[in-house]
Amino acid sequence: MFSKQDQIQGYDDALLSAMNAEEQRQEDHIELIASENYTSKRVMQAQGSGLTNKYAEGYPGKRYYGGCEHVDKVEQLAIERAKQLFGADYANVQPHSGSQANAAVYLALLQAGDTVLGMSLAHGGHLTHGAKVSFSGKLYNAVQYGIDTTTGLIDYDEVERIAVECQPKMIIAGFSAYSKTLDFPRFREIADKVGAYLFVDMAHVAGLVAAGLYPNPLPYADVVTTTTHKTLRGPRGGLILAKANEELEKKFNSAVFPGGQGGPLMHVIAAKAVCFKEAMEPGFKAYQQQVIDNAQAMAQVFIDRGFDVVSGGTDNHLFLVSLIRQGLTGKDADAALGRAHITVNKNSVPNDPQSPFVTSGLRIGTPAVTTRGFKVTQCVELAGWICDILDNLGDADVEANVASQVAALCADFPVYR
């Protein structure tokens, strides 16, 4: 029998030590990975609740197990809040991740071998948009579009040309490393021209969309997916949204369960409900605007210091820095910044001569530091420190100096106050 007083401490100190070390790392390091953020204690409370004990295969009111009357209410709250937040008619809150939400869309709308058109991973797309190593590239005939390497922007006429040539059944608009605004009406126009479904993956910008600071794809897309972390600041999880279409709704529901998943994670769905409510609070829009302001200010510092920022800047929460001209690799830059307690991720850039394990770029994002309370002043200072390290790569004295300044800044802006 379990006791309410059971604790990890004293029972599994090896695990607790690793957990505590990670929490301390989050406090002591500046987090600039664009897909990472900090959740509220309310989100964590939901995830650590007794809801983790409940199996609930099926959907509210249509479960395969008994005892679901309360978790039905939890899931329905999450569904209604998601619909309200994004102006959707349909929401499925059960996907365990963004990739599983995307897989459900493929399963619902396509047959194996069908042609899909998505953004190349090397140009800012995502693994699930047709990369050869992903199910999306293994099970489907994946054709890729990219950016114009001169402008750093998507060439929609070129996307249209490719679509006319390959006649995809589905076109994917979305990214993991593209810093400009997607033209959803133009994507809709292209999809209609070739009779394709338009699938928008807004995982990176969902928080900006919810705040009204980035175009909402719902009026244009046949289906939209997102993660619930990143700019939404919720738990790790996925979400599917759509306009009213009973036939497609049934397909999406069946593709999630039983098509790709079994029982939903009710404790995570409760945490999603919390984060959707938080995203409807008045301060959420101000937070998202600060995310954009901080990213734009940081990108400008890199430009002023002589670095190439892909696409020439950013409209959202992230930007890519190309290190090709400096002759540096993303791997070495990532490691040097890590020694100074600044966490970024190496990232491929267009025409990258290096492998994806080495790369010639860095992806930098501001959601986490903005949650921490950083404003433009702190982000400009931070960008300068990063440039100092890149200009003196491998210089231990420079790294140590930056690390001491990072420590002071982190002390001034704790993750949880």
From Swiss-Prot:
Quote the EC number: 2.1.2.1
For this protein, the record's CDD domains field holds: SHMT
Localization, per the record, is: Cytoplasm
The first-level EC class reads transferase
Which Gene Ontology molecular function entries are recorded, alphabetically? glycine hydroxymethyltransferase activity; pyridoxal phosphate binding
N6-(pyridoxal phosphate)lysine: which positions carry it? K230
Cofactor entry: pyridoxal 5'-phosphate
Please tell me where (6S)-5,6,7,8-tetrahydrofolate binds in this chain: L121, G125, H126, L127, S355, P356, F357
Gene Ontology biological process terms from the UniProt entry: glycine biosynthetic process from serine; tetrahydrofolate interconversion
What InterPro entries does this protein map onto?
A: PyrdxlP-dep_Trfase, PyrdxlP-dep_Trfase_major, PyrdxlP-dep_Trfase_small, Ser_HO-MeTrfase, Ser_HO-MeTrfase-like, Ser_HO-MeTrfase_PLP_BS, SHMT-like_dom
GO CC term (a single one): cytosol
Any idea which UniProt keywords this protein has? Amino-acid biosynthesis, Cytoplasm, One-carbon metabolism, Pyridoxal phosphate, Transferase
Site location (Plays an important role in substrate specificity) = H229
Decide whether keyword Amino-acid biosynthesis is in the record: yes
List the catalysed reactions: (6R)-5,10-methylene-5,6,7,8-tetrahydrofolate + glycine + H2O = (6S)-5,6,7,8-tetrahydrofolate + L-serine
Return the similarity comment: Belongs to the SHMT family.
Q: Which NCBIfam families match?
A: PRK00011.1 (NF000586)
PANTHER family according to UniProt: SERINE HYDROXYMETHYLTRANSFERASE (PTHR11680:SF50)
- Write out the function statement from the record: Catalyzes the reversible interconversion of serine and glycine with tetrahydrofolate (THF) serving as the one-carbon carrier. This reaction serves as the major source of one-carbon groups required for the biosynthesis of purines, thymidylate, methionine, and other important biomolecules. Also exhibits THF-independent aldolase activity toward beta-hydroxyamino acids, producing glycine and aldehydes, via a retro-aldol mechanism.
Instruction: State whether it acts alone or in a complex, and with which partners, per the record.
Output: Homodimer.
Q: What is this protein called?
A: Serine hydroxymethyltransferase 2
